[in-house]
Amino acid sequence: MNTLKFWIKNARDIALPQSILPALLAVSMAAVHPDFSWWPALVALFGVVCAHLGFNLADDYFDYRHNDVEARKKVTAEGFRTHMEKCHYIESGEATPKELLMAMCAFLAVAGVAGGVVWWFRGWPVAVLTLAGLLLGISYSGKPLELGYHGLGELVIGVMFGPLLMIGMQFAACGVFDDKIVWVSAAVGLLVTNIVYSHAVLDLKADAQAGKMTFARLLRTRGAMLSFSGLFNLLPFAILIVGVAVGQLHWAYLSVLPLLPMSIYLIYSLAAHLNDKTIPFEPRWWMGPMGNFELYRRHNMDWFLIRWLVARNLVTFFCLVLAVVNVVLALVY
């Protein structure tokens, strides 16, 4: 049990809301369909969680082999700030690369079994979606594609945790997917992309040293990076507004609009970072849960985590609000 807890923690379970909440939102959207069933939905959700943990460990494993950890140390030694948490458990001797590989394979194997169970119940589309997710997840940092090193990693994450995950979850829960899930999953995918994109902007120096061509680095100029921050933060709300305007989505989907200040803060704070402007890193109630922020501050991680946590919480609240909307609509209609 202690070993399992160790690997769950080091697989960055703090990031699980970016997969669990979109999955639950998809289940809430599936609940109105006549063939809805809880048990394949729960099996699929379990598989999604295991896959997410496995992919995070895969990212650590391939980055470690790519010498990304040493690159981050070099950047820090040169006086630049960078996010230094990757593979600390290997650096400290708590685990070996071989043990990391075994843990990664174990999580992904369990996810594969869960996918197989849902495939048996729902049919071949589940197998296609599961295999596509596995291929993209491994290819994020792994050979031969190494998408995260060629400027496509952030976009791949958005596809995986947006349309691919949500369409798959709705199909697992009810055996079909509808037009609404396409609209909503596109919006969610952009917000998930925003989490890893913001991370990449904050880690530009370390990624450059490691030779990791993230999408943020591919854009090159501060203006382009800031423009895409605006796109990833604001387009999700625009998608829902258009969906309501053309009659594809119920007007209640606009209940997410009060979350806009979180998006505006992220754009503002990334602009400050790109322009080397000092801003206060003080949590506010509307930013959502911030964990032990004083601890982050003592470890000089407040500058990174306040932005990352706001981006994560934005996805969480966006999905929670829409899930509640769907439950209420199902009860009313």
Each predicted region: which residue ranges?
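Topogenic membrane-insertion module of multi-pass membrane proteins
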Residues: 1-43, 47, 55, 145, ...
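Small-residue-rich segments of transmembrane alpha-helices in multi-pass membrane proteins
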Residues: 21-26, 155-170, 217-221, 285-295, ...
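Membrane-embedded alpha-helical segments that form the functional core of polytopic membrane enzymes
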Residues: 24, 33-58, 70, 126-138, ...
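Helix-coil boundary and interhelical linker segments in multi-pass alpha-helical membrane proteins
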Residues: 27-46, 112-128, 165-186, 240-253, ...
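Acidic (Asp/Glu-rich) catalytic motifs at the cytosolic membrane interface
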Residues: 48-80, 194-216, 221, 225
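Multi-pass membrane catalytic core of lipid/isoprenoid biosynthesis enzymes
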Residues: 72-120, 216-247, 295, 299-319
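Intramembrane alpha-helical segments
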Residues: 87-176
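Extended hydrophobic alpha-helices typical of membrane-associated regions
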Residues: 245, 249-333
